[in-house]
Amino acid sequence: MKSFDEMTPKEIVQELDKYIVGQYEAKKAVAIAVRNRIRRQKLPEEWRKEVLPKNILMIGPTGVGKTEIARRLAQLSGSPFLKVEATRFTEVGYVGKNVDSMIRDLVEISVNMVKQEKIKEVERQAEELVEERILDALVPESKAVPVVTNPFINLITGGQQQQYTPEDRRRFRAKREEMREKLRKGELENEEIEIELEETVSPFMGIFGPGMEDLGIEITNMFSGMLPKQKKKRKMKVSEARKVLLPLEAEKLIDMDKVVQEALDRAQNRGIIFIDEIDKIAGKESAVGPDVSRQGVQRDLLPIVEGTTIMTKYGPVRTDYILFIAAGAFHVSRPSDLIPELQGRFPIRVELSPLTEEDFVRILKEPENAIIKQYQALLSTEGVELVFTEDGIREMARIAYQLNQRLENIGARRLYTVAEKVLEEISFEAPDIPEKRVVVDAEYVRRRLEKIVQDEDLSAYIL
């Protein structure tokens, strides 16, 4: 398979098609946007500074694939990705989260992403070090028989020095190799050992009120290097010790300065921030009440989207080349209700169409992570073969679409509630049913949902 940087916009859309049904225009827009970033990397330095990403505004009802398109794109490109709700933020001066925190969160995600990649590279070495530490606990050297040599040396060293004969050392090595063999064969997984772990005392957490969590984390990180690291002995099984020690040993092998440098570069040049519910901060604000800082949030958001420098605990981060994708249903407000400067920062606008009954049929069947495939995989662990007929799938799609028309339109999310209700009985009885092949047809779907769908009040609560 091609690396992401070699993929054409058409190929990116084809990859997104594996997970998201329809919405071609939105897929096309994001594919062009990320491809332009790759093109920008190939430009000479003077041109690279001039080319800024074209941010995208997605307009469409809930459950049509806005978030999923952005999330899958980030996974595909290996970009640091952060999803935030615009309603989470408040204007500077009000209690709540400032918009700057989204950049700090993105950098944190980027650092963790690069760190995990580097840990994977040194995993083999780390496993060898973990094996040695477990063997140290299983066969401590102190258990070898000491030989008293010079009493004057013992007097000076407080009796702590132990001398071993060559025979003792040979016996110790043989015992250690014997235990190594058993360890590699998995014979000692349930053996209990005592290992020493470092713990940093954190006296600052928990003293900061709501909206000040960031400050608490920053102060804790600032003092973490100065705080004493306490060593604590813990008893655990070998299998558990391996899980605990592996990340600790791997971290010792990686250069954190290089990790941070690469993570900052990745966040600045490849980062994607998805701002959901942007329509909720659009419109005229009131002088009092919960909407008092709507326009203030937009004004605070403006410099970040335009391009500014935000200080993080890892260093300054420029936001000029971060791709921002904003999304909203815009049922009550319109994109023109956003402040003009912010509108200008989202030049690419795509409208996602509401899902039809036929789209629902495709969503149930086609994506690689399709709902019915998920249930088939889950129940196969109990030895149950779940078979969906074409008319059964169409009946589920029809009922979900009908409920969306009658009740609140929640898009494809309605399919999850319908599928869950249809398969509730099978999921409950799966381990005990004698007939391990279950066929879900239209009749079966109607039988499971008939009463609920007919009762308006009941369907409003259950589906």
Curated annotation (Swiss-Prot):
SMART domains in the cross-refs: AAA (SM00382), ClpB_D2-small (SM01086)
Record InterPro entries: AAA+_ATPase (IPR003593), ATP-dep_Clp_protease_ClpX (IPR050052), ATPase_AAA_core (IPR003959), Clp_ATPase_C (IPR019489), HslU (IPR004491), P-loop_NTPase (IPR027417)
Superkingdom in the source lineage: Bacteria
Protein name as annotated: ATP-dependent protease ATPase subunit HslU
Amino-acid positions noted as binding ATP in the UniProt annotation, renumbered to this chain: 21, 63-68, 276, 341, 413
Keyword annotations from UniProtKB, A to Z: ATP-binding, Chaperone, Cytoplasm, Nucleotide-binding, Stress response
Source species of the chain: Thermotoga petrophila (strain ATCC BAA-488 / DSM 13995 / JCM 10881 / RKU-1)
Annotated function: ATPase subunit of a proteasome-like degradation complex; this subunit has chaperone activity. The binding of ATP and its subsequent hydrolysis by HslU are essential for unfolding of protein substrates subsequently hydrolyzed by HslV. HslU recognizes the N-terminal part of its protein substrates and unfolds these before they are guided to HslV for hydrolysis.
Principal cellular location given in the protein's record: cytoplasm
Gene Ontology annotations of biological process type: protein unfolding; proteolysis involved in protein catabolic process
UniProt GO MF annotations: ATP binding; ATP hydrolysis activity; peptidase activity; proteasome-activating activity
HAMAP family given in the database record: HslU
Subunit and partners: A double ring-shaped homohexamer of HslV is capped on each side by a ring-shaped HslU homohexamer. The assembly of the HslU/HslV complex is dependent on binding of ATP.
A GO term from the CC aspect: HslUV protease complex
The keyword Nucleotide-binding is annotated on this UniProt entry: yes
Subcellular locations according to the entry: Cytoplasm
Family stated for the protein in its record: Belongs to the ClpX chaperone family. HslU subfamily.
SUPFAM superfamilies on file: P-loop containing nucleoside triphosphate hydrolases
